[in-house]
Amino acid sequence: SRKMDSISRQVAKLQGYVYEQLEIDENGTARVILPQEVLQAYQLTDADTAAIVGAPGRIEEVGLWAIFVEQPEGHYRVRMRSKVIPINGIAKNHHGGGHPLASGANAFSKEEIEQIYTEMKELVKK
């Protein structure tokens, strides 16, 4: 059945926000930050963001991406994905880990968000 592919209207709106706000550099490294107020506006939680993690990857130019989801406690859960280049090394450097093309990490400041995005961009330049 097609039910498997369906998402709630709220998640669809969040996906729209992701596409609207997605920042993509010249080498196809992308990121978006989902603040608590955005999640609250759509009445969603961190768990609901799992459904939209793959969204940036549907864009041709995007090769790797991170979605930074602000938690109620203030830090950010980082959902990282890549089409080719392994990213789990970066995840390990930032309180996380996972598979080569699908990893998770945590960022405890705006600076760490920048650091993670910079490390991802460096991966592509190599």
Predicted regions and their residues:
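Hydrophobic helix-and-loop "lid/oligomerization" segment in the mid-to-C-terminal part
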Residues: 1-126
